[in-house]
Design a protein with these regions (language model features):
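Regulatory N- and C-terminal appendages and interdomain linkers associated
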Residues: 2-78, 94, 307-347
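Short linear motifs in intrinsically disordered
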Residues: 2, 71-84, 265-269, 301
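Extracytoplasmic/periplasmic, Sec-exported soluble proteins
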Residues: 84, 106-110, 183-190, 286-290, ...
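Conserved ATP-binding subdomain of kinase catalytic cores across diverse folds
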Residues: 66-175
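C-terminal catalytic region of ATP-dependent kinase domains
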Residues: 221-347
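Short polybasic/polar patches that bind polyanions
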Residues: 119, 200, 315
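Extracytoplasmic/secreted envelope proteins and their assembly/folding machinery
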Residues: 89, 111, 115, 192-195, ...
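Conserved kinase catalytic-core segment
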Residues: 108-111, 116, 171-248
Length: 347
């Protein structure tokens, strides 16, 4: 028995050393990429991370930020396949000449819905739609995507994300970090962190994690008056609506797992600061320093989202009737927890 315990301890130490070594390697590569990146300075005259969403209870969760008129229109024509990313993806051009990035895999439904809820809270997102089935003309001799597009060029269950024309996009080493941006300490940034935790988005990597793929970016938009606005946003909401946690325990699009963590969504409130149960890629940056007043400000918008909107958004994102019912109830429970904080200042 003592020999077995010794062996187990040695194995555990070896695994721990291996994990630490991998993370140190990723950190070093990310640091190198950021330091050696060719400068792409932000050209905007102002920065934004949030805008007033208006009458939240009237927003169309089925169509999302792009609206019904913004949906992809067939026929779709193959443009190129992408080798990056954890899931198969390619670009297509639709009947209106717009380019879409098409993705398959376990993030399709969660990402499509998560962008709708973040949008309803006032945050910038990329326009995304769920397309149940279709055909991509010219999609032959594919690599990874060959498992998602048949020999007849037909596909099922895809997320179409618009590649918006005229927008200058700063990705990866040119993005932003949770602890270094123009909004540090503001209610707008803290509100975004709450949305991340509300949706159980455990993959909140930023520019410091560029070796593994940063999920933050800056999009420069030219406004009607000619002003260039730099919009700070999260560009990957796929790792949501499941369980947060350490590697090996996380999940995506898993209602039972998502619901099982509702009781630990908020741990408590002390001296006006909220304590959270969330664990993700950047746990400390997501959870620290969020006050009751931050939650009250955010709930002015999120609190107006109706169950009907949640359900319609989920169904439009590919959820089954059962999944839509489960997620609607589970999300409402978390929103009710935020409401309780707003009312009592405690939990």
């Amino acid at each position: 028995m003592p020999k077995l315990i010794t062996i187990l301890l040695v194995v555990a130490c070896a695994v721990a050393v291996g994990i630490v070594s991998v993370y140190l390697f990723w950190w070093a590569v990310s640091r190198y990429k950021v330091l050696t990146a060719r400068e792409r300075p932000v050209r905007a005259s102002r920065a934004a991370i949030w805008r007033d969403p208006g009458e939240v209870e009237r927003l169309d969760f089925r169509a999302g930020p792009g609206g019904p008129e913004g949906a992809p229109v067939p026929p779709f024509r193959f443009v190129e396949e992408h080798a990056t990313g954890s899931n198969p993806s390619l670009s297509v051009r639709d009947a209106r000449g717009r380019v879409w990035r098409v993705k398959w895999g376990d993030e399709v439904k969660s990402e499509t819905f998560a962008t709708r809820l973040a949008w309803a809270a006032g945050y910038f997102v990329e326009v995304a739609y769920y397309v149940d089935e279709g055909e991509i003309e010219g999609a032959i001799d594919l690599g990874r995507a060959s498992s998602c597009v048949g020999e007849d060029c037909r596909f099922r269950e895809a997320r179409f994300e618009m590649d918006e024309a005229g927008v200058r996009k700063l990705f990866d080493e040119h993005g932003w970090s949770w602890d270094d941006n123009p909004f540090t300490g503001t209610r707008e940034l803290n509100g975004l962190k709450v949305v991340v935790m509300l949706l159980a988005n455990w993959d909140n990597k930023d520019v410091r994690d560029v070796a593994r793929g940063s999920n933050t970016a800056i999009f420069e938009h030219r406004l009607a008056d000619g002003t260039i606005e730099a919009r700070y946003l999260i560009i990957d909401w796929g790792a949501t609506l499941g369980k947060w946690g350490i590697p090996g325990t996380r999940a995506k699009w898993d209602c039972e797992g998502y619901r099982s963590q509702n009781d630990s969504f908020v741990r408590g409130v002390k001296d006006g600061v909220v304590s959270w149960g969330y664990t993700g890629q950047r746990t400390d940056e997501a959870t620290a320093g969020i006050t009751v007043e931050d939650v009250r400000w955010l709930y002015r918008y999120l609190g107006r989202v109706t169950d009907r909107q949640l359900r319609e958004g989920l169904l439009a994102s590919g959820a089954s009737e059962e999944e839509a019912g489960c997620f609607t109830a589970a999300i409402r429970q978390r929103l009710d927890t935020l409401k309780l904080i707003c009312q009592r200042g405690e939990i």
